[in-house]
Amino acid sequence: MENNEDLIKELITLLANDRWHEEDINEISETVTSAYNDPEAYIDSDEGAEMAWLLEVDPEGIPTWVIFNELFDVFVVCDKIDELHEQIQEVFPEAPVPDFPYGQFPGTPDYFIWLDKLLKGTPPGYQLISFGDSYGDNLQGLIVSRADTERIMHLCKTLNIKASKSMLD
C-alpha cells in the first residue's frame, strides 16, 4: 500500500504534466506532504503564514491550496471566460486554439463542451480540469494529459483534494 507521500508525489507529477523538473516536483511534494500531514504546523510556518485565514474557512482545503500555490504557473485562473480562453491559448502557443468564440455559444456550458472537444483533439489529448477552490469568483483549473485524468481524480479523491473532470461540476 502506498503512503500519502507517494500519492502526493504522483499527483504533483501528473498535474505538472512535464512542465517542471524532477527536483522541483520533489520539493513541491515535500511541501504539500507537510501541509497535508499537519496543516496547522504548516500554517504556523513562514511558508504558510499568509494562509492563516484558511484554518477558519476550510482547514481540509489547506493541502489543495498549497498545491495551487506551488503550481500556480501552470494554472489558468480568472473571473471571465474569455480571459480563461486566452490563458489556455498561452498554454498551447503552437496548437490551433482559435480566438475566443464571442457570440457562438448561448451559455458557458456550451463553451466548455466545445473547449473539451478541442483539447481532446490536441495531440496527445488534453483536458481542462477544475482544481481547488478560488474562495471567490474565479474559475480555477489546469490542463492535464487526458490519459492521466482518471488517475488524477482517483488520487484527489483518496487524498481529499477538491477537483473535478469538468469546469461545469
PLM feature segments, named:
Residues E2-F92:
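N-terminal, charge-rich interaction modules
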Residues N3, G107-Y111, D148:
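Short amphipathic alpha-helical segments
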Residues R19-E23, N37-E40, P96-F100, Q127, ...:
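Residue-level signal for secondary-structure boundary elements
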Residues E30, G103, G107, I161, ...:
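A sequence-level detector of short, solvent-exposed, charge-rich linear segments
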Residues V66-F131:
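Surface-exposed, low-hydrophobicity interaction/linker segments
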Residues I113-D169:
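Acidic, proline/glycine-rich low-complexity IDRs
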